């Protein structure tokens, strides 16, 4: 009961703060939203991607078995964000440009069984930091708040490493490019400090690329058996999430 009461009090307080931000209270002097800004914050992102690996078994040069290992992964990541941009504002609208860089280190490991020979391949996929550049346009809700829409270009860096049955590995790096769009809200605490909160969805695509790792064994009858593992880079990655930064505004 005590926990429920505290939660209710907290929710009520947040509602009061939100109401005060958009209406009521004393008049707030007009804030100059024009200028260059730079800020730091955090982002909570959800990564979704598809990837395919293949294990092939051959004897005497002929394929005996080829097994596909498709993977659909969904991973969340919390990481630091840097932001900079420039805003133009009138009495009732805002427009501008914004760039964000988020450091992420999304990792996933998948096992690929090699039938008939009892050995395994595995591959590790890493999706690293991503960079976005967007145009934005919106309206002022009041003297200290504005809502806007944004859209632009984004890129994310990745790396896939394929491990064989022995202490051998091969890797490939790739960069995925795509578009990003979202909605945001800015609250100005004072003339030079504001909170920038946004939700965005980004879709990335990349050219198909792959790496292969092969090994050979011999059966009891002396027949040579070859085993190879192949993995493709993620060709399609979707990222959606929330970003919050605190920025300092230079009215220049």
From Swiss-Prot:
Changing residue 33 to L: In strain: Henzerling. InterPro entries: OMP/PagP_b-brl, OMP_b-brl. GO terms for biological process: monoatomic ion transport. Changing residue 228 to L: In strain: Kerns and Scurry. Residues 1-23 form the signal peptide. It is found in: Cell outer membrane. One of its GO terms (cellular component) is pore complex. Its main location: membrane. The keyword Cell inner membrane does not apply. Belongs to the Coxiella porin P1 (CPP1) (TC 1.B.43) family. May form trimers. Able to form a pore in lipid bilayers. This is Outer membrane protein P1. It comes from Coxiella burnetii (strain RSA 493 / Nine Mile phase I).
